[in-house]
Curated annotation (Swiss-Prot):
The protein's name: Asparagine--tRNA ligase
GO biological process per UniProt: asparaginyl-tRNA aminoacylation
Gene: asnS
EC number per UniProt: 6.1.1.22
Broad class of where this protein is predominantly found: cytoplasm
EC main group: ligase
Family: Belongs to the class-II aminoacyl-tRNA synthetase family.
HAMAP family membership: Asn_tRNA_synth
Catalyzed chemical reaction(s): tRNA(Asn) + L-asparagine + ATP = L-asparaginyl-tRNA(Asn) + AMP + diphosphate + H(+)
Subunit structure: Homodimer.
One Pfam family matching this protein: tRNA_anti-codon
Cellular compartments per GO CC: cytoplasm
Keywords: Aminoacyl-tRNA synthetase, ATP-binding, Cytoplasm, Ligase, Nucleotide-binding, Protein biosynthesis
Location(s) in or outside the cell: Cytoplasm
Length: 467
């Protein structure tokens, strides 16, 4: 049986010239010469570039099938690897047998015909868009980054923990949650006071899709010392912007016996590790992004790796912004949450490097963040990167039960909803810290693709849950 070879392995020189192999993939383009030859560009998704197959007109099905091949048809091609005389490719496939696995019903109406399509149009055909250069490249980069994240944490002695997608806890206390219910919406059970009786629901209480795996992650960090979660999270935030998704993936490490400084160091080490990985492993895709999407993609990643992270207190950051002379759209004052324009000024213009802003006002941060001695700020941090602004948010967690209870009350939350989380402070409490990295935000930064809807396979946004 002939050896099955990926296009990537052939183009990387892992298949020797003269060897006969079978390539399985799809037609990107076909052109015919007057000399009785057809040139097929075949891709299989294993790398950015297709391989060129040279087809002679003496192949049995040349007239009946080869000359009918169009963009999108699937084929199984067997042939010999040969050095290519053409520019831009080292080898080609001299075909001696081609089987057509699947035809495109009507090439005239095929949504992915061989022409340039707008990124907006591609969102309307999300089930077919991975066949395009840009979305195929995004998918490979996404895979590379995910694998690098898992490798990094494994090498650092972390354990991966699967946290639940269905929860009764609001980690962020913002209330922007998707309710999970099996109740009959046309015949809702009611309490004596007329409220919906969730005790009759599937879980016996009001339940939601998770906004974060952090609280559950803390439980395991307080036993395994170093853990991370990596999975989908959900926010019912009615925002139709290039930066928001209703369903997205989060990377959330938690470390016991750790301070905010340990947290910042972990964030820096992780980001630099995954950026090195993508530069080493996905050079072909990054060159495409550099040429067609963002000319600074590769330079930005290399600069990030070679940068020392600046560190600054929130209060000092506000000072810098006030003295900048910039007319920001959102006015600056102590107590505000930094907007994207503020973050980018700090990273791109003032420090010209990644920067960790820490010790934020407690009133704009979550209840679980450790209260500082000043009583006004919490041990929170954001990692800001040139070109995007915030890329990571984290904190040292509040390990003191009495302080945690006070913060829960201040936020208008119910202590009984967090009984198990409070138990972690009652039984062998320990200083611990962690952060959250929005995975799609990371992909946006790496690829230069500006709309977050284009870096996740099937985006979920307000009034859009197609596919």
């Amino acid at each position: 049986m002939t050896k099955i070879a990926s296009v990537a392995n052939i183009l990387k020189g892992k298949i020797t010239v003269g060897e006969t192999v079978t390539v399985r993939g799809w037609i990107r383009t076909r052109r015919d010469s007057k000399a009785g030859l057809s040139f097929l560009a075949i891709y299989d998704g294993s790398c950015f570039d297709p391989i060129q197959a040279i087809v002679n007109n003496d192949i049995e099905n040349y007239e009946t099938e080869i000359l009918r091949l169009t963009t999108g048809c699937s084929v199984v091609v067997t042939g010999k690897i040969a050095e290519s005389p053409a520019e831009g490719q080292a080898v080609e496939l001299q075909a001696n047998k081609i089987e057509v696995s699947g035809w495109v019903d009507d090439p005239e109406t095929y949504p992915m015909s061989a022409k340039r399509h707008s990124i907006e149009y591609l969102r309307e055909v999300a089930h077919l868009r991975p066949r395009t250069n840009i979305i195929g490249a995004v998918a490979r980069v996404r895979h590379c980054l995910a694998q690098a994240i898992h490798r990094f944490f494994h090498e650092q002695g972390f354990y991966w923990v699967a946290t639940p997608l269905i929860t009764a806890s609001d980690t962020e206390g913002a209330g922007e949650m998707f309710r999970v219910s099996t109740l009959d919406l046309e015949n809702l059970p009611r309490t004596d006071k007329g409220a919906v009786d969730f005790s009759q629901d599937f879980f016996g209480k009001e339940s939601f899709l998770t906004v974060s795996g952090q609280l559950n992650g803390e439980s395991y960090a307080c036993a395994l010392s170093k853990i991370y979660t990596f999975g989908p999270t959900f926010r019912a935030e009615n925002s139709n912007t290039t930066r928001h998704l209703a369903e997205f993936w989060m990377v959330e490490p938690e470390i016991a016996f750790a301070t905010l400084a340990d947290n910042a160091k972990l964030a820096e080490d992780m980001l630099k590790y995954v950026f090195r990985a993508v530069l080493n492993e996905r050079e072909d895709d990054l060159k495409f992004f550099e040429k067609h999407v963002d000319k600074n993609v590769i330079t930005r990643l290399k600069d990030f790796i070679n940068s020392d992270f600046a560190q600054i207190d929130y209060t000092d950051a506000i000072d810098i912004l006030l003295k900048s002379g910039k007319a920001f759209e959102f006015p600056v004052s102590w107590g505000i949450d930094l907007s994207s324009e503020h973050e980018r000024y700090l990273a791109e213009e003032y420090f010209k490097s990644p920067v960790v802003v820490k010790n934020y006002p407690k009133d704009i941060k979550a209840f679980y963040m450790r209260l500082n001695d000043d009583g006004k700020t919490v041990a929170a941090m954001d990692v800001l990167a040139p070109g995007i602004g915030e890329i990571i948010g984290g904190s040292q967690r509040e390990e003191r039960l009495e302080v945690l209870d006070k913060r829960i009350a201040e936020m208008g939350l119910k202590a009984e909803d967090y009984w198990w989380y409070r138990d972690l402070r009652r039984y062998g409490t320990v200083p611990h810290a962690g952060f959250g990295l929005g995975f799609e935000r990371l992909i946006v930064y790496v690829t230069g693709v500006q709309n977050i809807r284009d870096v996740i396979p099937f985006p979920r946004t307000p009034r859009n849950a197609n596919f």
